[in-house]
């Protein structure tokens, strides 16, 4: 028997029981933990204990309640291969470097929006970690951003500036960035004075909100090499895996595009979802320094994915959602639900059959509603600028709020990727994003009667991409649906715009219903994924809210979205639960997007109001009757905003003018000069550069106003890329432009929106044959004004340019108030030079750019007492550059701003004589 055990690798344990306590005593060791405040605490542990015991000691020492964000990092590991203490593994197998040992308490998972953290202590620890990372150079940032960050750190530590205590040089012993100098500290001291009144927690929140806009926020970097042995960094972020060369992101692989990650010896593999018309799996490979670092990277990827996927789910929804996600992990405890997880040797598997993939030719990103502050040294700090949202507590009684929470914290990182040379191994992939399925599982009758009273409004009933967002409905409500079904492009959210017609028959209508006093909506449903049939309205109770709303809900209408939620994969009972949950929201409204197969006969339409809703007279307006005066056009605009018809008209308008080619933009040598692959200039209106390379993604947009004998000229262009800055300044030089208007920050929530094509004052930056010097920089609460000197190094000629950067546009959607924007437009008008184009850009050069052109054109017309038709303005713009004014929310914003300018007299009328 003994020999048999030895043959199998076993051995007989003859250890006496009396020896066990002595063994345990000898295994006690000392571990030191360095916390984020710099203090070191020693703990006595047993080597046989699991890592969780030491983690619990660290958590208990600080009194941390949100423990999931933090971990213990090994202190002796290289910077480019961080290793974390595993909770489920014995300490003796992890701490092999001898005792006593030192570990570092650190934030491991940085969520996209730290404002949603529940505990102030957690936010304080985030602040300490970010401050340390900036100070030690792990989190790089521009000098101007570093000044602002340091000023908030000073406010947190010293409190309000006091001239009697804080004498010049009081920060001499403070360290904020690796290579700071006296000039840097003097700027910090100056800015500290502006933060008077901010509490410590508020200053720290401001610090976090700026830090989270930096490119490397929340990115865990691992060193590696490509297949040609060239150095690169692999970063693990909340939404996927990024590849950096010389600290520039060259590729990004979202989790939704990754089927499996694996490793073999020193090679790390990313298995991507197949593209359309591809029969083979697409695999990207990297070389790591050694087997340990390769396994370490793989493990960290698995744990990051598991953590951030779980954070997207409400606790009540995890069990249901696990049906749609199949995740494999070496540690099943890390995944959402153990029974639905596969264990895969050396890899993580997603089951593509269990999820509905969107178009693989698209990349979507979502931004948070909070604003990204600009990176300028004179940025003001008052609370009104930093709209720090209160953390929301998850509650099953308020499903609507939880749905918003999930949407807002969902993040997909995006950085422009130009085509790499053939020697680069991490090739660009097409990327997509599938919404996760959210549901509550409760027992409800197979058919339920639901009712409601009051009003609703119509939504776009067209096949054009995009959506109508009437007042009171979340702006993401229809936009997300059209992005899912039609590939609709949103400037702040997508790399592609795909103009696809809807696959289904009929047209879409948005219906809003408010329940009656008893909480009933008044209609029955049949169908669901469990019944293997679409969800259809089977019965409408007479005189119920569903029957009296306009447009009314009809029997046979197919339910597509409920409060912005795609219900195509949900059971009947789950859908009923979603509808009931809407009664608990603040507005109590139920917003349904339904597909209606055919328009009812006129005999079925009971009122003229309903007829005008379904067939608005101004669906294809020319010059509406009574609208040939300014007053008449403003009255029509006001009524259109109230009824929602202006948004329907906007959705009916073509996004690209039929028949206009974009062939030059698609030439092979020009492809990498386009930030977005479907936002391209028409051949007929594109700006031609002087010289051999004549292409830039820019269009001439001339807004002619014959009745005013006026033409406003623009050059609308995308935000420059690192490889197009020289062409950008070539346009400025060729056209002798004196005004450049920028409508975005450089990054919004860590995503690059525009490359910085100008230097910080008073530095000089070279782009091609041009020297650019920023001579002055003046910051206000809404915009930054710069004076730049452009010098042609070949001729020695100089040209002065005014650069205006609007920084108050929120990361998501549109501004809540138009005051700042209107002041900015008025300032732009004051700097215009007669007959000279103004160069305007945002990120794609169509959304916010179109809003500004529309607003300035409308102001000119109001000033001259001429009628204003916003849709005609948009049509004229789209005849010259596709997709100008990009979303319904942008169009609604500019229409409301135009009406406000008229009603409040914000523009001085010119004397008709």
From Swiss-Prot:
Its EC number is 3.1.3.48. The modification Phosphoserine is found at residues 357, 359, 367, 381, 425. Residues 364-400, 417-473 are annotated as: Disordered. Signal peptide: none annotated. One of its GO terms (cellular component) is cytoplasmic side of plasma membrane. Pfam families: FERM_C, FERM_M, FERM_N, PDZ, Y_phosphatase. Residues 29-312 form the FERM domain. Gene3D superfamilies: 1.20.80.10, 2.30.42.10, Phosphatidylinositol 3-kinase Catalytic Subunit, Chain A, domain 1, Pleckstrin-homology domain (PH domain)/Phosphotyrosine-binding domain (PTB), Protein tyrosine phosphatase superfamily. Residues 454-470 have a biased composition (Low complexity). SUPFAM superfamilies: (Phosphotyrosine protein) phosphatases II, PDZ domain-like, PH domain-like, Second domain of FERM, Ubiquitin-like. InterPro entries: Band_41_domain, FERM/acyl-CoA-bd_prot_sf, FERM_2, FERM_central, FERM_CS, FERM_domain, FERM_N, FERM_PH-like_C. Substrate binds at residues 811, 842-848, 886. Residues 646-901 form the Tyrosine-protein phosphatase domain. Keywords: Cell membrane, Cytoplasm, Cytoskeleton, Hydrolase, Membrane, Phosphoprotein, Protein phosphatase. One of its GO terms (molecular function) is sodium channel regulator activity. Residues 510-582 form the PDZ domain. The keyword ATP-binding does not apply. GO terms for biological process: negative regulation of membrane protein ectodomain proteolysis; negative regulation of mitotic cell cycle; regulation of membrane depolarization during action potential; regulation of sodium ion transmembrane transport. It is found in: Cell membrane; Cytoplasm, Cytoskeleton. It catalyses: O-phospho-L-tyrosyl-[protein] + H2O = L-tyrosyl-[protein] + phosphate. Belongs to the protein-tyrosine phosphatase family. Non-receptor class subfamily. PANTHER family: TYROSINE-PROTEIN PHOSPHATASE, TYROSINE-PROTEIN PHOSPHATASE NON-RECEPTOR TYPE 3. This is Tyrosine-protein phosphatase non-receptor type 3. The lineage of its organism: Eukaryota, Metazoa, Chordata, Craniata, Vertebrata.
């Amino acid at each position: 028997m003994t020999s048999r055990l030895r043959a199998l690798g076993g051995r007989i344990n003859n250890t006496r029981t009396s020896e066990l306590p002595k063994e345990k005593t000898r295994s006690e060791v000392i571990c030191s933990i360095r916390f984020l405040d710099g203090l070191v605490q020693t703990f006595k542990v047993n080597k046989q204990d699991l890592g969780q015991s030491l983690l619990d000691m660290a958590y208990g020492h600080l009194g941390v309640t949100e423990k999931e964000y933090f971990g213990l990092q090994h202190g002796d590991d290289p910077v480019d291969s961080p290793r974390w203490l595993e909770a489920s593994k014995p300490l003796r197998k992890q701490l092999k470097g001898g005792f006593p040992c030192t570990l570092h308490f650190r934030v491991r998972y940085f969520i996209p929006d730290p404002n949603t953290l529940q505990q102030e202590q957690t936010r304080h620890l985030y602040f300490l970690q970010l401050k340390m990372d900036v100070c030690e150079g792990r989190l790089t940032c521009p000098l101007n951003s570093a000044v602002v960050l340091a000023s908030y750190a000073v406010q947190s530590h010293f409190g309000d500036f006091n001239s009697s205590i804080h004498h010049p040089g009081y920060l001499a012993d403070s360290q904020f960035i690796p290579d700071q100098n006296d000039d840097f500290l003097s700027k910090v001291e100056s800015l500290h004075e502006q933060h008077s009144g901010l509490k410590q927690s508020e200053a720290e929140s401001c610090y976090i909100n700026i830090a989270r806009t930096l490119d490397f926020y929340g990115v865990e970097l691992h060193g590696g090499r490509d297949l040609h042995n060239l150095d690169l960094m692999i970063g693990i972020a909340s939404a996927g895996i990024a590849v950096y060369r010389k600290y520039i992101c060259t590729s990004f692989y979202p989790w939704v595009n990754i089927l499996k990650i694996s490793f073999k010896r020193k090679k790390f593999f990313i298995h991507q979802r197949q593209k359309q018309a591809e029969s083979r799996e697409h695999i990207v490979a990297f070389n790591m320094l050694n087997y340990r670092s390769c396994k370490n990277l793989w493990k960290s990827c698995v744990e990051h994915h598991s953590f951030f996927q779980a954070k997207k789910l409400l606790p009540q929804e995890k069990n249901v959602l696990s049906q749609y996600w199949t995740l494999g992990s070496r540690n099943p405890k890390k995944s959402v639900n153990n029974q639905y997880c596969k264990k895969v040797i050396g890899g993580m598997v997603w089951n593509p059959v269990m999820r509905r993939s969107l178009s693989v030719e698209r990349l979507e990103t979502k931004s948070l509603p909070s604003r990204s502050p600009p990176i300028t040294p004179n940025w003001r700090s008052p609370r009104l600028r930093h709209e720090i949202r209160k953390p929301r507590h998850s509650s099953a009684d308020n499903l609507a709020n939880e749905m918003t929470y999930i949407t807002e914290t969902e993040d997909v990182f995006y950085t422009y990727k130009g085509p790499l040379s053939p020697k680069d191994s991490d090739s660009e992939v097409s990327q997509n994003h599938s919404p996760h399925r959210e549901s509550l599982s409760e027992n409800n009758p197979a058919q339920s009667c639901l009712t409601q009273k009051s009003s609703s409004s119509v939504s776009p009933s067209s096949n054009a991409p995009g959506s109508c967002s009437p007042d009171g409905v979340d702006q993401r409500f229809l936009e997300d649906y059209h992005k899912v079904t039609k590939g609709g492009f949103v400037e702040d959210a997508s790399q592609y715009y795909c103009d696809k017609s809807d696959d289904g028959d009929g047209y879409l209508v948005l219906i809003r219903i408010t329940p009656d006093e008893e909480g009933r909506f008044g209609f029955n449903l049949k169908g669901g994924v469990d019944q293997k049939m679409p969800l259809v309205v089977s019965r409408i109770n007479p005189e119920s809210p569903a029957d009296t709303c306009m447009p009314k809900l009809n029997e046979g209408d197919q339910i597509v979205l409920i409060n912005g939620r795609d219900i195509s994969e949900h059971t009947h009972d789950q859908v009923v639960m979603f509808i009931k949950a809407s009664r608990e929201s603040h507005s109590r409204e139920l917003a349904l997007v339904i597909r209606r197969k055919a328009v009812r006969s006129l005999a079925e339409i009971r009122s003229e109001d309903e007829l005008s809703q379904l067939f608005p007279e101004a669906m294809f307006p020319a010059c509406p009757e009574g609208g040939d005066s300014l007053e008449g056009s403003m009255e029509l605009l006001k009524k259109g905003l109230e009824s929602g018809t202006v948004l329907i008209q906007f959705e009916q308008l073509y996004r690209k003018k039929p028949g206009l080619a974009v062939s030059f933009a698609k030439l092979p040598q020009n492809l990498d000069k386009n930030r977005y692959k479907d936002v391209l200039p028409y051949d007929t209106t594109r700006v031609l550069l002087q010289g051999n390379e004549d292409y830039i993604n820019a269009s001439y947009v001339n807004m002619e106003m014959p009745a005013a004998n006026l033409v406003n000229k623009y050059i609308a262009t995308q935000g420059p890329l690192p490889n197009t800055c020289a062409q950008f300044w070539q346009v400025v030089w060729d056209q002798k432009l004196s005004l450049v208007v920028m409508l975005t920050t450089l990054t919004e929530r860590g995503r690059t929106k525009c490359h910085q094509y100008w230097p910080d004052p008073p530095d000089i930056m070279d782009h091609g044959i041009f020297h650019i010097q920023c001579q002055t920089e003046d910051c206000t609460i809404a915009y930054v004004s710069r004076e730049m000197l452009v010098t042609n190094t070949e001729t020695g000629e100089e040209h002065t340019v005014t650069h205006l950067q609007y920084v108050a546009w929120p990361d998501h959607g549109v501004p809540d108030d138009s005051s700042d924007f209107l002041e900015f437009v008025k300032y732009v008008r004051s700097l215009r030079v007669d007959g000279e184009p103004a160069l305007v850009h945002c990120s794609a050069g169509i959304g916010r750019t179109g809003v500004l052109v529309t607003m300035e054109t409308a102001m000119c017309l109001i000033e001259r007492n001429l009628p204003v038709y916003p849709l005609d303005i948009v049509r004229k713009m789209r005849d010259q550059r596709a997709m100008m004014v990009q979303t319904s929310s942008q169009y609604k914003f500019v229409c409301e701003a135009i009406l406000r300018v008229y009603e409040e007299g914000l523009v001085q009328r010119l004397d008709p004589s």
